[in-house]
């Protein structure tokens, strides 16, 4: 917890602010991108969430253990009874709203300058993202488009676009001003109103100038409107949104990309093109950073992965001080 009572002058109230620092923050002089996230109670600690946590810290620590760069994450608690009021820029006669503009202004003009002053950040828009779910997804979309000079990445999970038609008027009027990466996510079990809203927004974003390489809209079969669903999708969204940073591997990390064959993978990965005599360890991680296969001094020219669940994985081969990393899809 960074501050239990951080003052929000735009709203004249105080709020708990959380901060996640990368594992190497204290031992390096590096500067880091920043991801701002809403509903801070649900991001890091199950004891502060009544609905389950995203496990953002565990997930990023796991990615870091694979040699993947991770950002600073700033979590802003929601305001309880004020949550919808603060996350909705327009008034809904049934649910409230109307303070989203002030909340977004707080993020941009009060909180971000404080974070940039007190921590080793990369403050440029290219290195700043925003992410949230449900109403937090809605305000992420709003803030990212309104402040394209501040944010270049938006993670929009299960957005509640249905709550106000004003979101469509806003989006069509704002226009693309800067290159962006916008990642929308929806569970297949969230209902037609949510799902169709996401696809309509995809079309609306394309209509104001965003290219297909700037947009991801994913409908995950069986996904529900829950923290556990968003938790399981967080790593994949982060890796795409921060793709340039994730893959900007300095020589001090001595990490090199490898191509994996076949990919997607059925039962076995072909290792025959690698010099196994020089290999110290072989390890496979899931997207939450959990090691699911580890072998020291492997000798077989194929790796059995048939017991892995379908999904995305990372294979890391270590030779002395070097690491070779490749991503694969298990069918």
Question: What do the predicted segments below correspond to?
Answer:
Residues 138-142, 180, 251-253, 265-272:
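Hydrophobic, well-ordered secondary-structure scaffolds
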Residues 248-249, 260:
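Disulfide-bonded cysteine-rich modules in secreted/extracellular proteins
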Residues 1-247:
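Non-catalytic cap/lid and distal C-terminal segments of serine-dependent acyl enzymes
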Residues 254-331:
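C-terminal outer-membrane/trafficking sorting elements
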């Amino acid at each position: 917890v960074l501050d239990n009572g951080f003052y929000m002058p735009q709203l004249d109230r105080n709020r708990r602010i959380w901060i996640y620092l990368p594992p190497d923050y204290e031992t390096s002089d590096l500067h880091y991108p920043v991801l701002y996230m809403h509903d801070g109670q649900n991001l890091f600690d199950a004891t502060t969430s009544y609905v389950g946590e995203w496990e953002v810290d565990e997930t990023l620590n796991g990615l870091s253990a694979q040699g993947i760069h991770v950002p600073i994450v700033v979590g802003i608690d929601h305001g309880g009874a004020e949550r919808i009021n603060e996350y909705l820029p327009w008034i809904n006669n049934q649910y409230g709203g109307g303070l989203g503009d002030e909340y977004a202004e707080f993020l941009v003009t009060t909180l971000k300058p404080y974070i940039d002053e007190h921590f080793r950040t990369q403050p440029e828009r290219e290195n700043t993202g925003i992410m949230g779910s449900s109403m937090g997804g809605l305000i992420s979309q709003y803030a990212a488009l309104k402040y394209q000079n501040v944010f270049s990445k938006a993670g929009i999970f299960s957005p509640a676009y249905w709550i106000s038609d004003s979101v469509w008027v806003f989006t069509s009027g704002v226009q693309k001003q800067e290159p962006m990466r916008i990642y929308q996510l929806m569970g297949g079990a969230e209902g037609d109103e949510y799902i169709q809203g996401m696809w309509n927004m995809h079309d609306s974003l394309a209509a104001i100038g965003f290219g297909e390489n700037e947009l991801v809209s994913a409908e995950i079969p069986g996904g529900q409107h829950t923290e556990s669903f968003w938790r399981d999708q967080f790593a994949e969204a982060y890796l795409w949104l921060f793709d340039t940073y994730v893959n900007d591997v300095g020589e001090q990390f001595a990490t090199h990309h490898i191509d994996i064959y076949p990919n997607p993978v059925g039962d076995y990965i072909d290792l025959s093109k690698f010099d196994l005599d020089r290999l110290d360890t072989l390890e496979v991680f899931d997207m939450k950073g959990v090691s699911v296969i580890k072998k020291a001094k492997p000798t077989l020219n194929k790796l059995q992965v048939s017991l892995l669940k379908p999904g995305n994985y990372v294979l890391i081969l270590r030779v002395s001080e070097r690491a070779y990393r490749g991503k694969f899809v298990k069918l």
